[in-house]
């Protein structure tokens, strides 16, 4: 094989965004090793530039047709670019909110940025992976980096406990996923590429269903679907808050990207079975997530159970399996990025100024910090689906797609649990705007004078303003976003029941195709 042929099969240009991030994290790591804490003044901003560059390089890739690279292991199409951009944006928002937070804990910013960028690269590779080994390596890159981030504030016993729980449960889920993948490898006769596996296993069998169950169990851990959610509340409460923000958006987006790619490519012969399983997961997640959130006293635990319920809403679009369903799923993940990052930015600001995340301590916040109260209120109301905020349009699109596909029960349950979620979101908003001085919490009474001059607070302010604006306007100005997600879905043939690029290539190279 000559170099020209090798270069053509590698198509390394498709991973230019990931390459930029790898170079960025290496520079940040070397700077931290050489300069130590002095590098903390500029490495976060260098990481922001690297993420911005990675996102910018996706724009020309968006105009190109679907391209297979690395001998069929990776595909760059509109769907993968959408999820890669979503994960990169979540990392960008996480960095903006983490500079002041990590600096205040006394930990190294350079090391934090390196691990966060590593997790981002792993998640972005998952979005386009189409080969079993490639998928598992990318998944473990994201997972191991996430474990390290969870326990990053090692002086905090809660962070250590959260990291240990996350590691143990995550290792078990990885083993389950790997076992399901190994079953696919054996049943298909040694194939590792997902389209080849689908062609080799074109009929339903008991072994294929068993493999499906194991694979779904591994994926469900990533998206915090009930009953694979046990790690979520404890990890969200104990981990550093910026890490929780990334796990709730970036890691969850990678999990849904893997679910779409893996299940639609490798399991077309058992579509009814995996749709039934995800229907059950959606029902359990919507009910448990939103009902248990009612009883929480910590903002981080409330948002943890909220994220479980939100995953249930997203699964409605996945279950119906139509173009509108997939598009509504992508649209909701996009608006969820802004409203959830905005909510966590507000939680970080409040905890930096008061040292607590208890819901009761937010009482009377409006009198001391109107901007923070407004931002948190808009983000929480958007998560609840109050019009005209972005979350309302996201849920309307999801429920409309489900209703159009005949999933009436799921849609009605989604509406009911959305009403439940509005109660616990509005409870926080109502507490913040109490007017009586005697109702003000002790933390708010001792609230420091609002200042943005300290190191790391200005990026936090930028992140807050950007997410709140996006949360407020994304629904009203939704047409460009609708076009974006529709293009991402239309470009993927397996979502429209057409032959995929990989399937066509495999058929052409197989002996049957040549004859």
UniProtKB/Swiss-Prot annotation:
One Gene Ontology molecular-function label: quinone binding
GO biological process: ATP synthesis coupled electron transport; photosynthesis, light reaction
InterPro entries per UniProt: NADH-Q_OxRdtase_suN/2 (IPR010096), ND/Mrp_TM (IPR001750), Ndh2_N (IPR045693)
TM ranges: 14-34, 42-62, 79-99, 109-128, 132-151, 167-187, 206-226, 240-260, 274-294, 302-322, 330-350, 374-394, 396-416, 462-482
Organism classification: Bacteria, Bacillati, Cyanobacteriota, Cyanophyceae, Acaryochloridales
Function: NDH-1 shuttles electrons from an unknown electron donor, via FMN and iron-sulfur (Fe-S) centers, to quinones in the respiratory and/or the photosynthetic chain. The immediate electron acceptor for the enzyme in this species is believed to be plastoquinone. Couples the redox reaction to proton translocation, and thus conserves the redox energy in a proton gradient. Cyanobacterial NDH-1 also plays a role in inorganic carbon-concentration.
GN (gene name): ndhB
Localization: Cellular thylakoid membrane
Name by which UniProt lists this protein: NAD(P)H-quinone oxidoreductase subunit 2
Subunit record text: NDH-1 can be composed of about 15 different subunits; different subcomplexes with different compositions have been identified which probably have different functions.
Catalytic activity, as annotated: a plastoquinone + NADH + (n+1) H(+)(in) = a plastoquinol + NAD(+) + n H(+)(out); a plastoquinone + NADPH + (n+1) H(+)(in) = a plastoquinol + NADP(+) + n H(+)(out)
A Gene Ontology term for the protein's cellular component: plasma membrane-derived thylakoid membrane
């Amino acid at each position: 094989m000559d170099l020209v042929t090798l270069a053509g099969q590698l198509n390394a240009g498709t991973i230019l965004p990931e390459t930029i991030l790898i170079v960025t994290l290496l520079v940040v790591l070397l700077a931290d090793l050489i300069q130590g804490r002095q590098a903390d003044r500029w490495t976060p901003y260098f990481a922001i530039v690297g993420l911005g560059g990675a996102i910018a390089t996706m724009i020309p890739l968006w105009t190109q047709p679907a391209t297979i690279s690395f001998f069929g292991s990776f595909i760059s199409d509109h769907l993968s670019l959408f999820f890669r951009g979503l994960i990169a944006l979540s990392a960008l928002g996480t960095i903006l909110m983490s500079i002041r937070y990590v600096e205040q804990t006394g930990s190294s910013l350079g090391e934090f940025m390196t691990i966060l960028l590593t997790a981002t690269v792993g998640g972005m590779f998952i979005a386009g992976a189409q080969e079993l080994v490639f998928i598992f390596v990318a998944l473990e890159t994201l997972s191991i980096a996430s474990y390290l981030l969870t326990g990053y504030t090692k002086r905090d016993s809660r962070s250590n406990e959260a990291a240990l729980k996350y590691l143990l449960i995550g290792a078990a889920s990885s083993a389950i996923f790997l076992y399901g993948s190994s079953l696919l490898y054996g049943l298909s006769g040694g194939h590792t590429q997902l389209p080849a596996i689908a062609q080799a296993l074109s009929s339903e069998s008991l072994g294929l269903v068993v493999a499906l169950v194991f694979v779904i169990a591994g994926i469900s851990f990533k998206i915090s679907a009930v009953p694979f959610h046990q790690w979520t509340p404890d990890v969200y409460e104990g981990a550093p808050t910026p890490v929780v923000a990334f796990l709730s958006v970036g890691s969850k987006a990678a999990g849904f990207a893997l679910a779409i790619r893996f299940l639609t490519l490798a399991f077309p012969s058992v579509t009814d079975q995996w749709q039934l399983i995800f229907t059950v997961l959606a029902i359990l997640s919507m009910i448990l997530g939103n009902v248990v959130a009612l009883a929480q006293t910590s903002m981080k635990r409330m948002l943890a159970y909220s994220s479980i319920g939100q995953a249930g809403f997203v699964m409605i679009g996945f279950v119906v399996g139509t173009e509108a369903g997939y598009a509504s799923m992508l649209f909701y993940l996009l608006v969820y990025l802004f409203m959830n990052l905005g909510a966590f930015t507000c939680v970080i600001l409040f905890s930096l100024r008061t040292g607590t995340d208890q819901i009761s301590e937010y009482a009377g916040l409006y009198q001391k910090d109107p901007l923070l109260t407004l931002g948190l209120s808009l983000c929480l109301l958007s998560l609840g689906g109050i019009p005209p905020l972005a979350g309302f349009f996201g849920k309307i699109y999801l429920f409309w797609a489900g209703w159009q596909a005949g999933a009436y029960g799921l849609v009605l349950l989604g509406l009911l649990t959305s009403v439940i979620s509005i109660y616990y979101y509005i409870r926080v908003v109502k507490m913040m705007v109490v007017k009586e001085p005697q109702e003000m919490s002790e933390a708010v009474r001792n609230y420091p004078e609002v200042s943005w001059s300290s190191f790391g607070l200005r990026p936090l302010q930028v992140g807050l303003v950007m997410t709140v604006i996006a949360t407020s306007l994304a629904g009203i100005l939704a047409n460009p976003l609708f076009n974006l997600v529709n293009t991402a879905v239309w470009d993927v043939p397996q979502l429209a029941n057409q032959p995929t690029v990989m399937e066509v290539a495999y058929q052409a190279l197989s002996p049957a195709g040549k004859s």
